[in-house]
Amino acid sequence: AVMGRNLALNIESRGYTVSVFNRSREKTEEVIAENPGKKLVPYYTVKEFVESLETPRRILLMVKAGAGTDAAIDSLKPYLDKGDIIIDGGNTFFQDTIRRNRELSAEGFNFIGTGVSGGEEGALKGPSIMPGGQKEAYELVAPILTKIAAVAEDGEPCVTYIGADGAGHYVKMVHNGIEYGDMQLIAEAYSLLKGGLNLSNEELAETFTEWNKGELNSYLIDITKDIFTKKDEEGKYLVDVILDEAANKGTGKWTSQSSLDLGEPLSLITESVFARYISSLKEQRVAASKVLSGPKAQLAGDKAEFIEKVRRALYLGKIVSYAQGFSQLRAASDEYNWDLNYGEIAKIFRAGCIIRAQFLQKITDAYAENAGIANLLLAPYFKKIADDYQQALRDVVAYAVQNGIPVPTFSAAVAYYDSYRAAVLPANLIQAQRDYFGAHTYKRT
C-alpha cells in the first residue's frame, strides 16, 4: 500500500491527475486525507475507477505478488477496452508475468511487467524502473515512467525498455539477487573488521565513510556507515541489539532457482541466500556453539593494512557477484529471446535503486566497449582489479578460515574466480565416475 501511495504521489507531482483505488475504502480515504490539495481522485468501485480513465487506459497495479495480482486483473477486465494497458509494478515472479502477458494479449489487452526498485522513498522521489512487455505498449507509458524515474548524475532517467513479456521482472529479480550478495559481502566485511581488529562502532563508521569516498561508493555502504552510529532510546548502539536473523521475501531464492534452471553458476548470490537461512537457525546455532569446537579469532595484525585488505576483498567480491548476475542475464536473454541490453540495464541501476553504486558506470563502459563479452571479469578494467586485488581476497579468506570466521560469499568469490580461470578442472574424474556406474559416456580430449 505504501509503494502504491508513493508512486501515485510521484506521478501526481509530475503534473498528472491520478485516479486511485484500493479494495479497502478506509485506505483510499486515508491517502486522500493525508494529501489535501493533491490531484488524487478517489474511487470506491472498480467500475468507476476504470471509467474515470482516458483511453487507452494506463493502470498501475501495486498489489502483493501471486494470486492477488490475478484477482486484481480479473476484477479490471470486465471494464477494459481493447488496447488498454495494465502495468504490474509488484515483485512478481517472471514466469507469472510471461503467462499474464500471453493471456491478456490474447484478449486484446496490453500488459507491462515492471520491476520497481528503490523502496518507499524511491517510489516517492524517483525509483529505478524496469519495464517489460509489448514495445508499442511501453511507448504509450514511457512519458509517465520517464518523468517519475530516478535521474542519474549525467541527467539520464533510470528507466529503459527491457524486453518482451517477463524481461522487466526478471531483471528486477536478478537486481534483488545482486542486492542479497552485496549485503552479505558487506556483513562479512563487518564481521572481519570486528573479529579481526575489534573495531568499535565509531571506528567502523569512520572506515565505511572512507570507503564510500572511493571505488565502493554506493547506497549500501552509505547507509551502513549511518547504521553503525545509530543508538536506541537507551543509548545502546542499535546494530548491537538487533537479533542476528536476516529475513527474506523470496526474490533471492527465485534468482538462485533460475540459475539452476539455466545451468548458471550463481554461487556467490546463492551463498548469500543460504547465509540468511543459516542465520535464521538461531536456536540451533546457540546450541551448536556450546558443542562444536573451532579456533578463536586472533587479531589480524596491522590495522590499516588489514582494513585495506578487507576493502579490496569486498570490491573484488562485489565484481564477482555482478559478473555472475550479468552472466545469468545473458543466459536468460538467450533462453527467453529477450535481446537484453546489459549496458543499459547497468545504467538504470545507477540511481534510485538499492544497488546503486558508482562502479555500475564501469559495467556500462565494459559493454559499450564489447557488447558480446562473455563475462565481466574479462573486461580490461575488471581484469586489472582482479589482478591487483585477488591477493587481498585470498589473504582475507585464509585468515577467516584459520580463525573460524564464516565468510561464505568471500569464499565463493575466490572459488568462482579460480574455477572460471582454470583451463582444466577435475570434472574429468566426475564424468569417469558417471560412466562407470551409469554408462553415461564421456567425451575425449
From Swiss-Prot:
It catalyses: 6-phospho-D-gluconate + NADP(+) = D-ribulose 5-phosphate + CO2 + NADPH. Keywords: Gluconate utilization, NADP, Oxidoreductase, Pentose shunt. It comes from the Bacteria. SUPFAM superfamilies: 6-phosphogluconate dehydrogenase C-terminal domain-like (SSF48179), NAD(P)-binding Rossmann-fold domains (SSF51735). The active site is at 172 (proton acceptor), 179 (proton donor). Changing residue 206 to D: In strain: CT42. InterPro entries: 6-PGluconate_DH-like_C_sf (IPR008927), 6PGD_dom2 (IPR013328), 6PGDH_C (IPR006114), 6PGDH_Gnd/GntZ (IPR006113), 6PGDH_NADP-bd (IPR006115), 6PGdom_BS (IPR006184), NAD(P)-bd_dom_sf (IPR036291), Pgluconate_DH (IPR006183). Pathway: Carbohydrate degradation; pentose phosphate pathway; D-ribulose 5-phosphate from D-glucose 6-phosphate (oxidative stage): step 3/3. It holds the Pfam family 6PGD. NADP(+) binds at residues 1-4, 22-24, 63-65, 91. Changing residue 300 to E: In strain: CT27. It is an enzyme of class 1 (oxidoreductase). Transmembrane segments: none annotated. Its EC number is 1.1.1.44. Catalyzes the oxidative decarboxylation of 6-phosphogluconate to ribulose 5-phosphate and CO(2), with concomitant reduction of NADP to NADPH. Homodimer. Belongs to the 6-phosphogluconate dehydrogenase family. This is 6-phosphogluconate dehydrogenase, decarboxylating.
